[in-house]
Amino acid sequence: MAQKGQLSDDEKFLFVDKNFINSPVAQADWVAKRLVWVPSEKQGFEAASIKEEKGDEVVVELVENGKKVTVGKDDIQKMNPPKFSKVEDMAELTCLNEASVLHNLRERYFSGLIYTYSGLFCVVVNPYKQLPIYSEKIVDMYKGKKRHEMPPHIYAIADTAYRSMLQDREDQSILCTGESGAGKTENTKKVIQYLAVVASSHKGKKDTSITGELEKQLLQANPILEAFGNAKTVKNDNSSRFGKFIRINFDVTGYIVGANIETYLLEKSRAIRQAREERTFHIFYYLIAGAKEKMRNDLLLEGFNNYTFLSNGFVPIPAAQDDEMFQETVEAMSIMGFSEEEQLSVLKVVSSVLQLGNIVFKKERNTDQASMPDNTAAQKVCHLMGINVTDFTRSILTPRIKVGRDVVQKAQTKEQADFAVEALAKATYERLFRWILSRVNKALDKTHRQGASFLGILDIAGFEIFEVNSFEQLCINYTNEKLQQLFNHTMFILEQEEYQREGIEWNFIDFGLDLQPCIELIERPNNPPGVLALLDEECWFPKATDKSFVEKLCTEQGNHPKFQKPKQLKDKTEFSIIHYAGKVDYNASAWLTKNMDPLNDNVTSLLNASSDKFVADLWKDVDRIVGLDQMAKMTESSLPSASKTKKGMFRTVGQLYKEQLGKLMTTLRNTTPNFVRCIIPNHEKRSGKLDAFLVLEQLRCNGVLEGIRICRQGFPNRIVFQEFRQRYEILAANAIPKGFMDGKQACILMIKALELDPNLYRIGQSKIFFRTGVLAHLEEERDLKITDVIMAFQAMCRGYLARKAFAKRQQQLTAMKVIQRNCAAYLKLRNWQWWRLFTKVKPLLQVTRQEEEMQAKEDELQKIKERQQKAESELQELQQKHTQLSEEKNLLQEQLQAETELYAEAEEMRVRLAAKKQELEEILHEMEARLEEEEDRGQQLQAERKKMAQQMLDLEEQLEEEEAARQKLQLEKVTAEAKIKKLEDDILVMDDQNNKLSKERKLLEERISDLTTNLAEEEEKAKNLTKLKNKHESMISELEVRLKKEEKSRQELEKLKRKMDGEASDLHEQIADLQAQIAELKMQLAKKEEELQAALARLEDETSQKNNALKKIRELEGHISDLQEDLDSERAARNKAEKQKRDLGEELEALKTELEDTLDTTATQQELRAKREQEVTVLKKALDEETRSHEAQVQEMRQKHTQVVEELTEQLEQFKRAKANLDKTKQTLEKENADLAGELRVLGQAKQEVEHKKKKLEVQLQELQSKCSDGERARAELNDKVHKLQNEVESVTGMLSEAEGKAIKLAKEVASLGSQLQDTQELLQEETRQKLNVSTKLRQLEDERNSLQEQLDEEMEAKQNLERHISTLNIQLSDSKKKLQDFASTVESLEEGKKRFQKEIESLTQQYEEKAAAYDKLEKTKNRLQQELDDLVVDLDNQRQLVSNLEKKQKKFDQLLAEEKNISSKYADERDRAEAEAREKETKALSLARALEEALEAKEELERTNKMLKAEMEDLVSSKDDVGKNVHELEKSKRALETQMEEMKTQLEELEDELQATEDAKLRLEVNMQALKVQFERDLQARDEQNEEKRRQLQRQLHEYETELEDERKQRALAAAAKKKLEGDLKDLELQADSAIKGREEAIKQLLKLQAQMKDFQRELEDARASRDEIFATAKENEKKAKSLEADLMQLQEDLAAAERARKQADLEKEELAEELASSLSGRNALQDEKRRLEARIAQLEEELEEEQGNMEAMSDRVRKATQQAEQLSNELATERSTAQKNESARQQLERQNKELKSKLQEMEGAVKSKFKSTIAALEAKIAQLEEQVEQEAREKQAAAKALKQRDKKLKEMLLQVEDERKMAEQYKEQAEKGNAKVKQLKRQLEEAEEESQRINANRRKLQRELDEATESNEAMGREVNALKSKLRRGNETSFVPTRRSGGRRVIENADGSEEEVDARDADFNGTKSSE
């Protein structure tokens, strides 16, 4: 998993740094040296390179020391490429074998990466040091992430299980398995830590009363259980001496609602006895080291060496302080809710256990009775346990036992007393542990919420092999066998059964990991009974011992394959069991006692009656334990049926543990298990050391390789059809029609739409199965799709909201218009008199109704007040009743609680008594029945014994000698028959193996035939060689960059070191301050807690009062709101009345005015006025009275209302103040409490963190110092590597020769196969000769056996005669002696025959063993080939997936290409349109220029007329005489001239306006032209960029074509070397390829030249553009300045025409200056000087204009000055003419230059375009030519590859046939080995073998003929291929002439098909290349 940037310190232990993985040196070594793994005695496996192959042996050179070693081919294992170094999931390894897995684990372990995925489970190697990968930051990193998104970690396993539990609603379990010391307990703690953070129940919850308490207690349960249940062993400093299953319950939302812990088999014997260098349970050492003085005195504690039960005294644990751990344990007990009294009681029991070990007994002198000379330790024990010393001593030394109906005292021996004390200590500690566990479970399950599902975590003692292995080790190893069996069954059996159940094509694989035999050896109840059943059976026998148990075990299970008796017996109680992790030697001493676990009833009854309540509670259920005292009543003889225990009978430890384990396994089977395989790296507990053989043994035992293999080959991810459709239908929305219901068909349609590779999935009956990684890919696609959908939805929502807001604004606009219209209407209406009258009269109509409304309101108000009083009285009564009822309810609840507790206790007592009674009754009945059976059996046996004794006495004397001889012969016969039977069984076994091998051979043949079709795809791997050169070059650059980075990092590390030193000193000071603050805060916290309790009590009372007050307030607020509404209505009525009053007053005033106005009209009007005034006065009086009465009423109501409101507000304020005070006190207290707790927690954490940081900084400082030195060394090494890599790049070419050597090797293999064929024929002949020899020997043996059989028959007949004639033995004594002598001679001959027979049997067995060894070797080679075949299948699947991905890329690229073509056509259309528009604009500009020239010509004509008029005026002035003409004529002429001058001015102004319009049009055209030019330049630039991009693409394509051509050439060379027969045919292709390469190189050179020319043109074009842009900028500036000057000159023109001409001349000069600036940048300085001159000239003209204005004003007054003015004007006119002529000539010259530059620019642009187009066309033509060459070469290569494939196929078929013959020969060997059976069977087999050999020879001859035919067809095909190539070169003919042979015709047809495939592949090939 590549990480960006620099990895942090904690991430270094999680992520793999990819910069150090892709080493070019390692890659080169792997490719060049053919690196493999070979076995090593030290490292397990070593890297080596293959140097030479010698048949079945290979010579390799070790990489480490260069030593050459010869090893077998079967012992070599393939090495993975370097890119798979430190791979996170070992299922990704291409070569899966033990060496690769071990190497990967070793590399990751040495890099600090302890977690590694192994398929579906995780492997963790114990680092034996602290790693920074368990912080809160790491927890946040893994929270909610998918497994493939993060590196391997225990957090990832926990999160996966947690998410699966929530998503699938299935219970989960996490099983941490492994040997002792592998790290199971630590990983269990990390899982709980992660779940406590992720599934915290107080997040987002309202019930903050138990904020985080449950999670805190869950985390603190581990320290308590570890203190009381863990101990230091040889392998592990913190070994769990009990097993536990932690069940964490979750609700539906995923929050923790409770937990429960179950424990298994506490090793209580450790409390009294420990092995060397081991400790007892941690709590004993914690207590002695951590207890303070007062506690030491209370608990009577002593030193470590004063306790007998501490066998080794004080044994320290590295990096752990016992006193600190004691404090942590006490704190954990406090958090779990243990009171101080309970803690003290627990520690008292611990101390009493230690004191029990100090009680010493001695044997009295004359008797065996034990005595206690010193009872000091006993007094301490009794003081701690609260019992009487005398009673305790009596119970131990002289306990009371029941004999019959009497109770007597029995004196105990020293050994019995010691055993009783030790048993009491063990039982006490076990009961204490159980009590602690129940107390922890009670604390963890106090929420009483129902859990929807649970997640179980199993932490159980790992597999143990010690020097002395006892009963505890057997139980632990038995548990591990069951767990490993569960793993095997889940991973291998259930997985494959589900494949078959779902109908998936799957060949069942037997991984050979069945552990059932070993489990049955331990747990089987009968037929024959297992270890536990035999142990329980022996416990029933009173005289049974451990030796008798072992003897019976050897008798029953002696032949079991997993049971062994040690060869060298140290003790008769030893036996061995072969577990999955190895052979374990068990010592069965004291097993019967441990299994029965007896106790002294006298002591237990004492403890039950202890004065210490805690001790009595521990022993309260002592009566339920049925001791073994009843066993003494049994008779001496017992039946074997006693092993069957019935319900209610005595339950042994083994039975209880077996049942408990069965329940655990049932629970685990009902969950979905997640396995974590913990690996122990070494037994020295050293970090950084890895014992290869130890790790390999654990990997083999744990089934790691098999788990990876089934994960790779199988389909581990599966999902139900409906869920798959529901979850991933979004990815194929249109694939399923609406209303489609069939789930399976829907999934098939979705899969087709998703275009998944068929090899990646399988569709079953109810589920769809996927390979690893496919579902993760689909999840990523789904997330992307959902993101797009959400974005589209958000866009639609925003659009809807925008439209809605727009509609709302439109409605507001219409409303505003309506309001405006109404306001305008009102403004028009308000001044209308009738409207004013209407508004004044209308309110008066409602005055009469106000009195009635007021009266009704008063009545209503009175009723409301009465209801309020009544409600208040009822409220008080209800409050009183409520308080009474609540008190009664509390009393009833207390009584009910007491009753329920009493009932529960009574029920529990009743159940216990009933169970006890039932047990005792059943035992009694069983004993009585067995006693009767035993008595009957005893009587029968006695009678039979007497009869047998009599018979034996009769026969003993007669048959002593004959019986001895007969037994001897019988033994020999039995042994011979057993050997023959064994040989027959071996023959049957070999037959089965032969059949099995033949089936496997068929399977392998089918697989190999499938693989041969896909061999062409495998050949593509050779292409990787050509890419190595590029990779090495990139590696060199990367190494240089890394070197620089290393130097920077070294400097940063030095800075960091200095910074760390300063921080360390600061942290020391902070630690001291924090410790002081912690002490102060603890004091404050205690005080605040007391205050908080008191405040909470007050708060509860006040909350009840507050609730009542709030109810009153709500009711009063309702009344207030009603009154407020009434008051508002009254106020509104009053306002209306006042308004009416004002309106009436205004109306009265209006009427007065009207009356005053109309007073003088008529008398009738006066009368009306008087009447109106009277009415008005009456109305006024009435109105005043009403207002007064109304005001009085309102005043009264206001007073009443204010009184009520004030009372209510006072009450409300009081309640509010009380509530505010309470809330304030509550908040302050809660805040202070939370702050103090937070500060305390933070300070504690800070202290720990500071200490941790201190240690970490010290470590980092050392590491930094070492890194600095390492960095210097690495820098030097990197410099050397850079030089080496440059040399190694050159060595890559050597790899090509190796690849060519592979092809040559194929030819050699063909020759070797021919030689092997001859060898097999010779072997076959030898086998037949050996078979004949064996058959002759067997015939001889059979004859001898028949003779022996006849002799045996004769002896049997003689024996029968002897038995019939026993009575006549005395008479025939002499005859019998003779017969006996003959018999002795025959016995000797039989002895000699037996010896010969035995020798021959030994020779046959030796041959059998040799054959068996050969068979094992073949089996090994078969397994290796099977593994390689599996790896090839996996690689084939990967290649297919790559091909499908490339096809998808090809389709995408075709789409992109079509889009690019559309865009290019679009751009071409736009370019044409822009050129057309530019042409139109140019024509418009030319027409405007012509119009401008016409306007200038008109202007020039006007100037000429003006000049003529001036000349006439001069003539007139010159023609006047001195006295001349009179003034009247002069004035007349003056007026005429002035009128003419005015007319000329108007004409001039009109012309100027026209000129101005034309100039404006010209400016607009220039601006438009400028914009068009800018747009055209942008388009041109965009096209240039596009062309540049296309050029780059073409260059890339050319480069890729070069690489492809190089690949094709190399492959062609390889093919030519592989098949020498085709060399002549392929020479033409090589020549063509060389010519193509030369053409390509010439094209590349031409392309480089064109590129250089293009760059030159581009530079020139860019320079021209830059100069043009600068000219345009200066021109714009000058235009702006010119416009300002034009404005000034316009004002001057109005005053004087002469100044106008000067302005125009200056303007012309300005325009000429601008054009001169546009033409050349070199004349910029001259133009600036010219501009300054013109500005000076303009200023001068302005001064002259002022003077001329003064002259014009003076000319009206003084005519005399006209002559001077005319002369002055004529002079100025002459000068102006000369300057105008100069400017005109300069302007024309600049215009010519501008036109020339424009034409040059256009010519250059046209030339550049034409050159660019021509270069593009040339390049495209070259590319097309090269593509055609590549296509032609590809077609030729495909044809050659096709022919090569067909020859390879034929060759492989021949190889397979040869292999079949070899296998058949081996089969004959095996059949020859079966010659140990009967002679007839051997003869029949020999005849069958001869027939089979003849048939094989016929087949071989037939195969030889077929081989000859195949070679002839190959030659014919070669000729036809040459003909086809010649036809393909011509390319005219499309059909081929068939040859004579049918094989030739098939080749031609295949060639046709291959041509089509070649065309299709070429098209795909070109598409993919262009896409790249």
From Swiss-Prot:
Residues 661-683, 763-777 are annotated as: Actin-binding. It is found in: Melanosome; Cytoplasm, Myofibril. Keywords: Actin-binding, ATP-binding, Calmodulin-binding, Coiled coil, Cytoplasm, Methylation, Motor protein, Muscle protein, Myosin, Nucleotide-binding, Phosphoprotein, Thick filament. One of its GO terms (cellular component) is melanosome. The modification Phosphoserine is found at S8, S23, S40, S1684, S1722, S1954, S1971. GO terms for molecular function: actin filament binding; ATP binding; calmodulin binding; microfilament motor activity; myosin II binding; structural constituent of muscle. Residues 1789-1802, 1866-1876 have a biased composition (Basic and acidic residues). Muscle contraction. This is Myosin-11. It comes from Oryctolagus cuniculus (Rabbit). The lineage of its organism: Eukaryota, Metazoa, Chordata, Craniata, Vertebrata. The gene is MYH11.
